[in-house]
Amino acid sequence: MSPTLAELSEAELLKRLARFAPPDQLSDDTAALPSDRRPLLINTDVIVDGIHFSDATTTPTDVGWRAVAANLSDLAASGAVEIEGITVALVAPGRTSWDWVDGVYQGISAALGQYGGILLGGDCSKGEQRLLSITALGRLGPLRLHRNAARPGDVLVTS
């Protein structure tokens, strides 16, 4: 019998999905595409109601901010020095108020205003559960950082 997703770790899930991509393509949170300019880094993260946020703990504005911050943090950790922009996929039940959606996009806009980049586009769909999937695009600086390249003795800096 096939295991359920609840029974698999994230690492095991990525290992199983890796057969669908070029070697080492899924070994990091970002992908790098060659370009005439600096390579383009691409990252996607999903946040889901009831798992990553809830009305009891998170305002709509904070939901939008958090979604952008998660993506831009991954880009920065991979060596991005310039944010091109993001796309947003929003899924929400029909009962979701416009005020909630407006607040989410206000948070998205505020985060982009502080860290750079623009809203490039996206998609909206009706669904049973609210979620945001953001894809962020940034330009690589002089140093491409890979989480799987860390070695004992390397310096780790957080802020």
Residue ranges and their predicted role:
Residues 24, 56-72, 95-106:
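Glycine-rich anion/phosphate-binding loops
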